[in-house]
């Protein structure tokens, strides 16, 4: 502790402007770096706080035009840019949240640390901005290159609302990011990461290099912010910059998605989805990567979590074209839709007994997309689809009845693509649609008027299409009902079906 006291007394003195030459600045920053880098378990909290104050005074006292210069010789004198980079990394680590052993999400000490560190970063970036206008200080570019990565990670860690942030720390982090973009002459975060022009290679590789030690199986949970920084950063990078980093971004994304916590699974799947839609198919197919992605995503479909299912199905729908390309290239055109068949079969298996409304809604929301992708091959699943459609039309989904609207959309698509198989199902489908119209007309379902109106229109369209698929059978069956029915809404729908024109979606598909 005596040594700490001596350092605290002498830490600022060696950096006074009167001695502001680079050889004097380097040892002063090295001492502060040593104090910041001590293990947290050694009870040096007070010394660390004192080191932050000393660092702030040192930055303010140093001369701007000499701040980034250094000899880079003399053994331990590595040059100011490199030392500044190490100091900035130590500061970023100091302000980072840590995993709580008891599972508590709150990090009450982190926002204050982040606010202090953020103000130091603002001072450092201010020095860079001042040095840019000085023709006698070209070394600022080297200094900024060492600093920009850790400063960016700090800003992204603390700028959004998280368990380890406060309004004050979020504000400071936002200011740090804005100043960093201004100093690096970047118009956006994407420009900062990928480069603003052909000569600027960007800093995405640098950021990935800094995150890599914290994104392996043993370390990725020690800092709860790392996964968010990685995910957010990844999604700022688009084609054609992402594919060259595929080997670095795919393993962490798979690792995060394979976690037992649903939140992490969703985050990982979102990363995988961005990779699927951004990286060219040829790169995804190399080394069987696309197949690895498919199996990782397929396994998530067994988890009854609607947010996860939503993310997985969206990703799979974008992955199918990539997998189909591989089979086309192999000449196996008969099996190009194998993966889509597998997923739809599993979805229908889960949909039949499912009683949770959120999951039912999520499954139904994506059912039309699967029917569109399979087209006429949907006929393989027609029996299962019929059972799901009939069952789901009986249960309302307040307040907008999204589930039944999507089921009606699915039914229309099924009839369009598989119209030769529909006549034998006319009576069953007609009963289900009429029951739905009666329920809506009697106001027995607590949904909005707009939803009721839309459902009546969709159900009527389904009846018209069903009539065309059955070559007029529906009109004949409805004729007697129209005479005896006293419900004006039902009669109106029947009249629309009877007056249906020859043009219908069914006519467009008969030539397929």
Swiss-Prot record:
Residues 1-10 have a biased composition (Basic and acidic residues). InterPro entries: ARM-like, ARM-type_fold, Tti2. It holds the Pfam family Tti2. One of its GO terms (cellular component) is TTT Hsp90 cochaperone complex. Residues 1-23 are annotated as: Disordered. Belongs to the TTI2 family. Component of the TTT complex composed of TELO2, TTI1 and TTI2. Interacts with TELO2 and TTI1. Interacts with WAC; WAC positively regulates MTOR activity by promoting the assembly of the TTT complex and the RUVBL complex composed of RUVBL1 and RUVBL2 into the TTT-RUVBL complex which leads to the dimerization of the mTORC1 complex and its subsequent activation. Regulator of the DNA damage response (DDR). Part of the TTT complex that is required to stabilize protein levels of the phosphatidylinositol 3-kinase-related protein kinase (PIKK) family proteins. The TTT complex is involved in the cellular resistance to DNA damage stresses, like ionizing radiation (IR), ultraviolet (UV) and mitomycin C (MMC). Together with the TTT complex and HSP90 may participate in the proper folding of newly synthesized PIKKs. This is TELO2-interacting protein 2. It comes from Mus musculus (Mouse). The lineage of its organism: Eukaryota, Metazoa, Chordata, Craniata, Vertebrata. The gene is Tti2.
């Amino acid at each position: 502790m005596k040594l700490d006291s001596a350092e605290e007394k002498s830490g600022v003195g060696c950096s006074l402007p009167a001695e502001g030459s680079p050889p004097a600045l380097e040892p002063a920053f090295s001492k502060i770096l040593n104090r910041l880098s001590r293990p947290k378990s050694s009870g040096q909290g007070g010394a660390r706080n004192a080191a932050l104050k000393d660092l702030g005074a040192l930055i303010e006292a140093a001369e701007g035009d000499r701040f980034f210069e250094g000899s880079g010789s003399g053994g331990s004198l590595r040059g100011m840019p490199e030392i500044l980079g190490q100091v900035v990394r130590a500061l970023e680590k100091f302000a980072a949240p840590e995993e709580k052993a008891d599972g508590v999400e709150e990090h009450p000490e982190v926002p204050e640390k982040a606010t202090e560190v953020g103000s130091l970063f603002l001072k450092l970036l201010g020095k860079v901005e001042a040095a840019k206008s000085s023709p006698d200080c070209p070394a600022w570019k080297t200094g900024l290159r060492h600093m920009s990565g850790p400063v960016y990670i700090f800003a992204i860690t603390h700028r959004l609302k998280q368990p380890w942030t406060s309004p004050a720390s979020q504000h400071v982090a936002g200011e740090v990011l804005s100043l960093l973009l201004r100093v690096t002459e970047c118009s956006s975060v994407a420009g900062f990461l990928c480069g603003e022009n052909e000569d600027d290679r960007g800093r995405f590789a640098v950021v990935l290099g800094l995150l890599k030690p914290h994104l392996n199986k043993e370390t990725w949970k020690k800092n709860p912010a790392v996964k968010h920084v990685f995910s957010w950063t990844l999604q700022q990078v688009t084609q054609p910059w992402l594919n060259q980093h595929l080997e670095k971004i795919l393993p962490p994304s798979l690792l995060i998605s394979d976690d037992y916590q649903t939140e992490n699974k969703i985050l990982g799947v979102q990363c995988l989805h961005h990779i699927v839609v951004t990286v060219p198919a040829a790169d995804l197919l190399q080394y069987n990567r696309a197949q690895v992605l498919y199996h990782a995503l397929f396994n998530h479909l067994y988890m009854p979590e609607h947010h996860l299912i939503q993310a997985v199905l969206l990703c799979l729908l974008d992955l199918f074209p990539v997998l189909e390309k591989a089979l086309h290239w192999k000449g196996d055109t008969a099996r190009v839709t194998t993966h889509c068949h597998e997923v739809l079969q599993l979805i229908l298996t889960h949909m039949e007994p499912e009683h949770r409304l959120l999951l039912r809604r999520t499954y139904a929301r994506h059912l039309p997309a699967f029917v569109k992708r399979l087209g006429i091959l949907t006929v393989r699943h027609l029996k299962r689809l019929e059972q799901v459609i009939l069952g789901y039309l009986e249960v309302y989904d307040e307040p907008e009845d999204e589930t039944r609207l999507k089921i009606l959309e699915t039914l229309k698509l099924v009839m369009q693509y598989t119209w030769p198989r529909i006549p034998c199902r006319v009576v069953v489908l007609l009963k289900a649609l009429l029951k739905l119209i009666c329920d809506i007309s009697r106001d027995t379902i607590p949904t909005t008027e707009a939803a009721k109106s839309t459902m009546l229109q969709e159900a009527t369209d389904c009846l018209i299409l069903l009539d065309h698929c059955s070559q007029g059978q529906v009109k004949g069956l409805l004729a007697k009902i129209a005479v005896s029915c006293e419900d004006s809404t039902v009669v109106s729908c029947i009249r629309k079906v009877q007056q249906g024109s020859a043009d219908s979606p069914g006519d467009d598909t008969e030539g397929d």
